[in-house]
């Protein structure tokens, strides 16, 4: 059974942040959830926390909440999709249908990262890995055909528009991960005067400091906040990193808190000259090309349907994997047995003949597999598989 349990941007950020997982915590939970299901992948972003499962039996949601130390009172806020609905949901997510910024592209990298982390930490996930790979393949074709690059949208472009309208030219960025990099990449060609970088130095951010030395510079948090007109927060910390004491008395400051959990302490929201805009409010500012993107995406929805059918067909055909393995194993044994009858040949020649026989046998088996695949599509897979058993195994 294939299914997903999740919570997304339709639930307010104050509640959503309770279920957000840091990278370290995510890795820990992947291991613990493997006790409940054969395969697990966790997708955790600022807009959603989703857990994808593949197992022979459905896992009770209460057991999942217990394993994750989540408050069961919030269970009604979570959605659950099974089998085809689960496949459809992931494909819509990676294609941008389920994003607050409709059609945004950052989700593609996040889906890929979720797949990779699960592989590194949780071991083999053959079905879920295939699901995520097909979803990413679908997204690539969908975005190309829908020509979404002609109407790009990112958090950086939405925030940048606000800064331009407010004539803000000095910005501080706290959190130099993927979101921080996205903003640096956006600001390098903008007309802002200064970008103060707060956080651990890394190679990706270093390039901006080296190529644009007058615009980008690393800075201490308090010094940067004192100089800046705007603070952009996007760390992955499990707690607040900007506090009331970090803001000079009476300072006018615009803060974009893009982190989940929040980077900005609640006391900062109460400061009279400080305006804090959270991630959900930023997403609501996207209006310029939203309708155009929605129209283009709906026109190309058939691409998603095509890939859904492709994956369902693959998943259904998977029931024959043990038969295929057994047929190939049996054929190899027969080939090796026949080689024993060869006389007047040395060991090297015997090995070459054995390899040739196995290769020829596999050619016939591969053709039988193709016939089985066609029969499966037509609904007669069981009849065909029984014939293959009679021909190759009896």
UniProtKB/Swiss-Prot annotation:
NADP(+) binds at residues 175-180. Substrate binds at residues 45-48, 99, 104-106, 110. The keyword Transport does not apply. The keyword NADP applies. Keywords: NADP, Oxidoreductase, Porphyrin biosynthesis. It is an enzyme of class 1 (oxidoreductase). Pfam families: GlutR_dimer, GlutR_N, Shikimate_DH. During catalysis, the active site Cys acts as a nucleophile attacking the alpha-carbonyl group of tRNA-bound glutamate with the formation of a thioester intermediate between enzyme and glutamate, and the concomitant release of tRNA(Glu). The thioester intermediate is finally reduced by direct hydride transfer from NADPH, to form the product GSA. Belongs to the glutamyl-tRNA reductase family. Homodimer. This is Glutamyl-tRNA reductase. The gene is hemA.
